[in-house]
Amino acid sequence: MSGQSRESAWSLLTEYTQSESLRKHARAVEACVRAYARKFAQEQGLDSDAAAELEKKYSITGLLHDFDYERFPTPEEHPYVGNKILEERGYPEDVRRAIMSHADYTGVQRQTHMEKVLFACDELAGFITATALVKPSKSLAEVDAKSIRKKMKDKAFARSV
């Protein structure tokens, strides 16, 4: 991913996304996919340079997966408009494909590890945030694994989120 940096991805995100909650969501997904990239790199026995490059690619993908959503929120636009912007800015095809695959309605099947991880982390980050929002403090600090597992058993919880 030469040419793209986390800083340039953050700049692109903040150019298109003003909502602090969407920015927090992007950072949460970024952190989640980065952790999975680190684990995957270890499992694959990658050297430190290859592992760092993999982690960077996953991080940028997680950070940018919804960057266009605030301006282009409809299924006809998101993530299609974002994909075109990323292509114009030189982001690699695998990053763009992962971002396309995170939205079921695009019809892009999730095939690679990064595509599957992005989808899972996007869903999980949203669920954890919803769990925090029903706490009296509305704080992530009050959310633990037990409360998340409890909410996962409740089929009606966060259905409309």
Where are these regions (language model features)?
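Acidic/His-rich, divalent-metal-binding segments that scaffold phosphate/diphosphate chemistry
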Residues: 1-75
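Residue-level signal for secondary-structure boundary elements
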Residues: 21-24, 129, 160
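Short, intrinsically disordered, charge-balanced linker/junction segments flanking boundaries
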Residues: 37-38, 157-161
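Divalent metal-dependent catalytic cores for phosphoryl transfer on phosphate-bearing substrates
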Residues: 53-157
